[in-house]
Amino acid sequence: MKIGINSDMGEGFGNYRICDDEALMSIVSSANVACGFHAGDPIIMDRMVRLAKQKGVEVGAHPGLPDLLGFGRRVIQMDAAELEKHMVYQIGALQAIAANAGHRVTHVSFHAAMGNMVNADPDMADVVARAIATINRDFIVFSQPDAEIVRAARKVGLRTLTLFLADRAYDENGHLVSRKLPNSVVTSTEAVAERVKRFLDSGTVQTIEGKSIKVEARSILIHSDTPGSVNLAGTVRRVIEQGGGEVTPATVLLN
């Protein structure tokens, strides 16, 4: 079985680092690089792109809302046109940095509140998908299954890669449990290993209510800001490889 591992990376600013990006880059097949609004800055973005190139890792834009203090997790009211411009700005910045480093951007993966907006609002999803297709029709859109952005992306001819979030709890409707609730973030390597093995074996996840639901995904996400993220990502890779799987970049998965 071929499957990807991806992580949101470069989510610091200045001298602040949220995790060991270098160690994480040795584990993943795709890096979603913060583009300066919720986290990241030009120096960090450049470092991430060059490190990804060195490690043979694909790079994607990880745009978020302009909310450095809230790490892009707070809702900011804006219409679809405003959201589109904020996204385009960030993708363009990473494209330029990647070109300067001799690498290229292959995908887009939305961060937190921005992701929630395009996942839930069909009008916003349509506007954003059209903008991505205008920038580069070869871009792959990373998202959760059944999100509006997946529908909108496919409508305009973009490829999509759906995700299983190994470090986040799901409810019985297949939605992520709010981070405000207990046990919404999975930090135990044993629990992550069990979840990944179950997903690989049966395509299911156990919800926070204890039920089993199907999850359709081609790549497994670990958030870099989850405590112990490097160990968790290493656990994901180990479970995949011990089961005979192959960690594979997104562009290869969708060929």
Swiss-Prot record:
It catalyses: 5-oxo-L-proline + ATP + 2 H2O = L-glutamate + ADP + phosphate + H(+). One of its GO terms (biological process) is carbohydrate metabolic process. Its EC number is 3.5.2.9. Pfam families: LamB_YcsF. GO terms for molecular function: 5-oxoprolinase (ATP-hydrolyzing) activity; ATP binding. Keywords: ATP-binding, Hydrolase, Nucleotide-binding. It comes from the Bacteria. Forms a complex composed of PxpA, PxpB and PxpC. Catalyzes the cleavage of 5-oxoproline to form L-glutamate coupled to the hydrolysis of ATP to ADP and inorganic phosphate. Belongs to the LamB/PxpA family. This is 5-oxoprolinase subunit A 1. It comes from Bradyrhizobium diazoefficiens (strain JCM 10833 / BCRC 13528 / IAM 13628 / NBRC 14792 / USDA 110). The lineage of its organism: Bacteria, Pseudomonadati, Pseudomonadota, Alphaproteobacteria, Hyphomicrobiales.
